[in-house]
Amino acid sequence: MNELRPKNRAYQGYHRREIPREDERLTHTDPNTPMGELMRRYWQPVCLSAQLADLPLALLIMGEELVAFRDGGGRVGVLHRHCTHRGASLEFGRIADRGIRCCYHGWHFDVDGTVIDTPGEPPGSTIKHNACQGAYPAREAHGLVFAYMGPPDAVPDFPDYDTFHLPGVELVPYSIRHDCNWLQVHENLMDPLHAVFLHSRMGAIQLTEAWGEMPVTEWLELGDRVCYVASRRIGGNVWVRFNEVATPNFGQVGGFWEDGLAETFFQRVGATRWTVPNDDRTSTIFGLRHFSERLEAKGIGNKALVGVESLDIYGQTGHRPYAEMQRNTGDWEAEVSQRPIAIHALEHRGTTDRGVVLLRNHLLRALGAPPAPPSAVGGIVPTYTSNTVVSVPAPPGADDRALLRAVGRKVADIVAAGNALDPRERPAIIAARLAALRGMKLEAGEAP
């Protein structure tokens, strides 16, 4: 009788040399790919507003070579990079009071791609009526430039999230290029367990010591969102972290410096971000770092460090000495080092990876469905991302992890149930409901 041979055997490199193909459905985003066409149905950031000065800016977004500029009238244009006349790059163009001119023969384009003038043509020439420069609708918000690259007859409303309007919060834009596929960067947001190891136990403490506590974690789908709820025991308190991503590449993360030592209720976002493919092997995070007295009470954050290729959170860019990256590895190295495109078929996924699997399946289902705009209340889209720290002592002689799970579920239910509230009143109402969880005990029948 043949016995089952264990796979965990020594020196098996020879038998593990084959590298399968990547999952093209999720990772490829060029024109006419399923994920690429889905992403093009949403407004995508393409650069920072501050990058558009007196010269055009060359861009690569989802495999398309583009150029962005701000004309003399202050309008932003996002055009195909190569001039429709003879293909010269408009990154070398001349910004005009209205639109941009190609440096080669002076063809003049408006921000919408229409041809204004073809100066080398004779009077009466109709060539400008038979040509146009590819262009995409563009708009600015909170220091970022967004473009809509989908069908022109299906432009969605621009999503206005509640965390963009919180009193006393300053939004500071940033961008970080990653030398890898967009998905392995994005799905890190649904992997809260990596923080225990990468940010805490495997090197220097990168955030606070509380991150090194192993959480009780659950993942859930709420409409267009995939979320995680991670509950940690910090002395007599329970710290519940609620993070979210939304279809297809939007995400928010809670405040970074929470230590769980003092109560806080529905403390909101530390960063909002979009993970935008440049091509299939490179991507850029465009984000908004959130600063407020409440979020930065410990004085750790630094607005001066936030911008192009810079963030005030350790390990988020590739601009550190290589030896330091090896000794105290950050998110950037962990994500980029999974290969230019991570190979899902080679993974041995465990319980810590449930959120990643849930996100991948969520995206696969989205590929076969029409884009669904996020639900808004009075034009404002409610979001969930938050930190809550509530005084709930550990039960003597009982299963504390079951209590942590129950507290996390209560927090998630309260936050999600507040979607229909007036956005101006929602934070205070949710915070009051969360405060009522103080001293919560495990009810009979509740189990891990």
Model-inferred region functions:
Residues E3-P6, P45-L171, M214-V216, D413, ...:
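Rieske [2Fe-2S] iron-sulfur-binding domain
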Residues W43, D54, G113, L193-F197, ...:
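Secondary-structure boundary/capping signal
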Residues R40, C132, R139-A141, V269, ...:
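A short, structural micro-pattern
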Residues Y42-Q44, E64, G134, D224, ...:
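Short beta-strand or tight-loop elements
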Residues N2-A10, R75, F146, P152-P448:
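C-terminal catalytic domain of Rieske-type non-heme iron oxygenases
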